[in-house]
Amino acid sequence: MINIEDISKSSNQSEEKQLKSTSSKPKYSFAAKSLFKGSNNITPYYLSTSNTFQCVASESIQTWLLSDDGHIFTSSGNFVLDVSSGGYFVELVQLNSNSKTQIWTIDTTNNKIQNQGNGNYLDIDCFNICVAPLNGNATQQWTTFRRAPIPTGNWGYFQSEQLGSNNYWGLSVLNNSTSYNTSVVMNKVQAKSKGQIWQMTSDGHILSRLDGNLVLDIGPSINGSTTNYYLNTNVYKANDLMQQWGINENNQIFNQYYPNLCIGFVGQLGVDSTVNCVLAQPSSACDTCFQWIANPTYSLNQIVSEVPEPFPAYTSGDLLASYQYLSNDATSNFTDDIRSLYTGINVSLQSFLSIVTNATCPSSIHSTEDFSNVQNQIKTELIYAIDVRLVFENYSGFYSKLFSQGSSNLTNLANLINVDMSSNQMVNANYTDAITSIFYSLISEIPVGGSIIANIGQSAVEFGELMSQSNYQGASTYQVELSQLYTHLNTNYENEMANAQSMKDTILQDWGMMSKTYALCFLPTNDPSSLNMNGLDFEKISDVASVAYEIAMIQMLLPTTYQIYFTSAGYWVPYSDGDFAYSDNSGTYIMATIKYSNSYPPKELTDKLWNNGVSKQEFFLSAYGWNLATSLTYYNTTNQYSNIFKLAFPTIKNFTGVPMQFVMTNDGDNLGNFTVKTHFAKFFSTYYSVGDLGHHYFDIAVTDINKNKVANFTVDIKLKALEGSYVSIKTGSLVVQPGYAVGNPICNQGSYSLMFSASILIPIYKSE
């Protein structure tokens, strides 16, 4: 290959049952607590890790992932527990499916964790985790319990638990700068401030919403100290423990390289002040300068993940008689088990409460004390159930209103974008991404109030994923025919409504879950864990959500009609800015129809974008939810690029939270290597020459930042005389690694008459 040149210029389950997985992938998250209490016989210790990959007994709870084949993964899924080569200590290593010492059996009946390679049991030796023959000591006894996983892949705030005048204070990038090595500080949380919005990735990085590869990192030492550091932003680095973080049971954000150091701040949170954040050792476990709340908290996700706590049992005597009498009295003899109706749709719990409250002890029940105890308990349960149901009814009302105009909205947008909705053309339609973008808009524009809706909605999504795979009906489709798009959206809407209903029923059937949920209903609205909807501006919330959903539908439909035309800096373009153009240091991007590079979108369409806060940079670079293919274009043809119409330039879209890289080769010749930022697309911007008419094949290999394979495929460029090139993925060439999914490739023909290249966009998602 010749002429290579860079042209870009620059449920009520038992604990044991919960610890079982139905998948070969890491699925269920848990923590392990030792019955060993230390020298003071008080301090609890948990199975944890150190920065040397040695496993230790620590006061900090660590979340692990259990697979059905017995592997115990770190929460990031990158490493597994194994016995060291000496056969004694336990350490973290990469997965080796052929190693039996990486297989463990958790016995929740006898509180033992046994290694299948040597038959020994998990033990503690001077706070180091080891394996040893069964000895009956407390150091070999472990209680395991479900842990709701730290939500990854969702955007939100990290707010300080210190509140001043009811103002939120959050982790912030100074001045919303996208430059690396920018200080991370404390500021009051403000609407539409991307520098305050973060995402915890699956490998423990904390990603900023400001830019794709911008992450939280350790900054310079404070006065030369080895235990006190400033925080700043940096480029995402592979396997760098200084950029990887965890959250412990004290709501402290600790660093994986310095596990004893946590994020905090020093000073007073004054009005409109900026305070430097630091990495240091907290003065105590309850030092609020080092305690954080992830907002949304997804508190419901935590609640439904806990060990079930049944209602007080009434099995005999006057207790049972009282319960059955009150049940029959309240339900007009419909049932003697009133608790079975807490989830009933067509029953009035308010009516039941009134009857139970006014009931008197019948002569057939001898113990008025037992009757009174049961009566008070059922009254409390009904009060709790009424408020819990009201929370979900309000959410369902919001959600139903959001999608009530779905069919007409989709039709109107299709007409505006000039899309044939009866077509069998495939589009990328990931419903989960659409819902996530709605929740992001709510928390971004309405930090107080919007997070409550996001809390319920995202918890419902997480709850659906925690259900058994045979029952879960989530949004698993990444591509769908246009003619089936509305059906697809409606089906997934109904599934998510069902998930919320199922989560509500699970809560109403468990005394512990119902009590905890009820308590959240009376927290102040500005508390990140609150479910208190009193006083919320639902009109504003609905308006923001409706706009976000409309934008999500535009993201699905737009690539069927439009693409981006890129011209390198220094070459003539008809427009460099305006409603359908954007320029940066590399060149100019223009939106036009796929067939005609001089046919631009109507103002009504562009107004829906720019008037609703869509970032031009994100749009034209196909970042976040946008996925438009990009064609290389020269409006004034030069001899140097006169064969541009013969070429095809691929774009890789990374919908995941981990950076990727891709390389395109032809017959062994490397045509270019490119990094794809998280949630961004990367356009292959290296000019190359191509041969005669017919098929020409180019191989593309995609890896993540750690050099792990993601996908491989072959691009087929077909040349015909006096026509622009045709581009596609060669049949049978696509190989996708487990854990990833490739959406519908967007393939657009080049043009001989208008002198632009073919384009192909390949979207890559993280699959469950």
UniProtKB/Swiss-Prot annotation:
Q: Where in the cell is it found?
A: Cytoplasm; Membrane
- Please list the residue ranges annotated as the Ricin B-type lectin domain: 25-145, 116-248
Q: Which PROSITE patterns match?
A: RICIN_B_LECTIN
Q: Where the protein is mainly located, per its record?
A: cytoplasm
Q: Name one Pfam family in it.
A: Ricin_B_lectin
Instruction: Report the record's Gene Ontology biological process terms.
Output: response to cation stress
Q: Which GO terms describe its molecular function?
A: carbohydrate binding
Per the record, membrane topology reads: Peripheral membrane protein
Renumbered residue ranges of the record's region Disordered:
1-22
Q: Which domain of life is it from?
A: Eukaryota
Q: Which GO terms describe its cellular component?
A: cytoplasm; membrane; nucleus
| Keyword field | Cytoplasm, Lectin, Membrane, Repeat
Similarity remark: Belongs to the cup family.
Q: What does this protein do?
A: May play an important role in stabilizing and/or regulating the cell membrane during Ca(2+) stress or certain stages of development.
Cite the PANTHER family for this sequence.
CALCIUM UP-REGULATED PROTEIN A-RELATED
- Protein name, UniProt field: Putative calcium up-regulated protein H
Q: Which lineage do the record's taxonomy fields give for this organism?
A: Eukaryota, Amoebozoa, Evosea, Eumycetozoa, Dictyostelia
